[in-house]
Amino acid sequence: MDIIFYHPTFDTQWWIEALRKAIPQARVRAWKSGDNDSADYALVWHPPVEMLAGRDLKAVFALGAGVDSILSKLQAHPEMLNPSVPLFRLEDTGMGEQMQEYAVSQVLHWFRRFDDYRIQQNSSHWQPLPEYHWEDFTIGILGAGVLGSKVAQSLQTWRFPLRCWSRTRKSWPGVQSFAGREELSAFLSQCRVLINLLPNTPETVGIINQQLLEKLPDGAYLLNLARGVHVVEDDLLAALDSGKVKGAMLDVFNREPLPPESPLWQHPRVTITPHVAAITRPAEAVEYISRTIAQLEKGERVCGQVDRARGY
């Protein structure tokens, strides 16, 4: 069994050694331009077209939860990957736990009005504010995949009313489910906090725009943990300036790194993190990949395969 590995920033040598240890029967090598030798599996992140084109692979693993970079490259270069080759993404591998930490900490930050107190502090103003009540602080999760379910589970501990929206209806205990475009407005109408965990597909690009934001209750909050292209940034800024949206926590952006001239940097109601909400944990990723390859070799059914038509 031959495995090729490519990631522009990861510690390649660590990964190769870890994979060799986890899959002793495999010959693992770092792919470099000009390497056309045979391979059974490819582990990649933002791979060059030539790495995958023309190869008779058993599977490709994207080294992250998102596969939009591969799928967008496939649109421009369909010869890059045979349609019959299954494409897998890392399903959780510790990212769910990180998303839980990030989401819960920020929801509680808003719930306890720490954002308002920070603004008061900046002007040396001492004024206790009325508290929010959990039963009136409905949290909506936009996108009900693996990470969305993890976030919902963690928020249930705090007794917040929870709802989710996705393409198809879900049956999560204690979570009100909405499905399809026809139910999006009803979903949004009660969301004091909107957490975006949608996949990046042509249908979801720009979905968080003026029309969507207007359907939220006045003074709602936005937490974007998915992709920057989901948000029309000018529309969000307008909603923040008008008070329609009271605050936004943004981990992802249309352009990354976020340009210094972006007005998001200086907006008093915006908090920014540099795409760190959930990162790949190498040891857990290696364990998932080795387990999945073993299942594939045995002809067993596996989880995490991407539906290329849907984009996730």
Curated annotation (Swiss-Prot):
It catalyses: glycolate + NADP(+) = glyoxylate + NADPH + H(+); (R)-glycerate + NAD(+) = 3-hydroxypyruvate + NADH + H(+); (R)-glycerate + NADP(+) = 3-hydroxypyruvate + NADPH + H(+). InterPro entries: D-isomer_DH_CS, D-isomer_DH_NAD-bd, GhrA_Enterobacterales, NAD(P)-bd_dom_sf. The active site is at R227, H275. GO terms for cellular component: cytoplasm. Transmembrane segments: none annotated. It is an enzyme of class 1 (oxidoreductase). One of its GO terms (molecular function) is NAD binding. This is Glyoxylate/hydroxypyruvate reductase A. It comes from Shigella boydii serotype 18 (strain CDC 3083-94 / BS512). The gene is ghrA.
